[in-house]
Amino acid sequence: MNSKLEQLKTMTTVVADTGDIDAIRHWRPEDATTNPSLLLKAAASEAYRPMLEKAVAHAAQHGGSDAEQLTVATDMLAVLAGKEILGLIPGVVSTEVDARLSFDTSATLERARRLVDFYDRQGVDTNRVLIKIASTWEGIRAAEQLEKEGIRCNLTLLFSFVQAVACAQAGVHLISPFVGRILDWHLASSGRDSYPAEEDPGVFSVSRIYNYYKANGFNTVVMGASFRNTGEIEMLAGCDRLTISPALLQDLKDDQGTLARKLNPETASSPDKPGQINEKQFRWESNEDAMATEKLADGIRRFAADQIELEHRVRQLAQAA
């Protein structure tokens, strides 16, 4: 009997949710995703030291104010990490735009284009890069324009159905609906200790989005993210992609049980009918969803805080040089 991880790979593209080079080398996933939190953690390892030094040197050559050099250095670090990861996987890597720009369409466009330019200058095929952007109204508008320019996007911090509808409407390449953080909110608000996997609110959210997309012919890829346990993963077997932490990958590898497919494009059906979402509707429906409003804001704050900490680490290295 194959492990549940091997069974999952026959129906879903497995993505490693880590910036740890050694973990990616070990797991050999199809794709990989990174974010400021993962980069901050990875940057503490010696494997990242040469990349940090190269990023700082590049920023110094770029010139500009200290603040500008910091953003250049952290962008270049993300690109160098992405380049290293792409040498270990056959698919794509996702690189995130600074979360502090989540409510600024033009600034998001500028930074996204710079990331792609940095990849291009490193000799990387930019078709293997997805630009991660928070699923705010402004972020979705930026992604819509980037997709028209041939820059494929991964819309992250997605917690609500209206965000998913708006992303599909904008022609976004891929979305990352979060599972575990939705569960976290419902556990805290309900006072419950747990939910069975088949009743998990995060699983329900991703399943609803997946079935809506497939039943209505949307091409946007659904990549479930932010898992708290393997039960959530098993309930989403068959989803286009699932991005999974190394610890949960190990749990799936160690499990020799049978894994049943739960999501299938051939049998997808949805009571939700496609419609056009305008800004007023998006903001109202987002406001009415307390969980999505709170988790989106919290996610942006967390990524922004880790971005600031990453810049602090880069500044220390630059001052020591």
UniProtKB/Swiss-Prot annotation:
Catalytic residues in the record: K132
Catalytic activity: D-sedoheptulose 7-phosphate + D-glyceraldehyde 3-phosphate = D-erythrose 4-phosphate + beta-D-fructose 6-phosphate
A molecular-function term among this protein's GO annotations: transaldolase activity
Subcellular location: Cytoplasm
BP-aspect Gene Ontology terms: carbohydrate metabolic process; pentose-phosphate shunt
EC number: 2.2.1.2
Biological or metabolic pathway of the protein: Carbohydrate degradation; pentose phosphate pathway; D-glyceraldehyde 3-phosphate and beta-D-fructose 6-phosphate from D-ribose 5-phosphate and D-xylulose 5-phosphate (non-oxidative stage): step 2/3
Subunit record text: Homodimer.
This protein's name: Transaldolase
Gene: tal
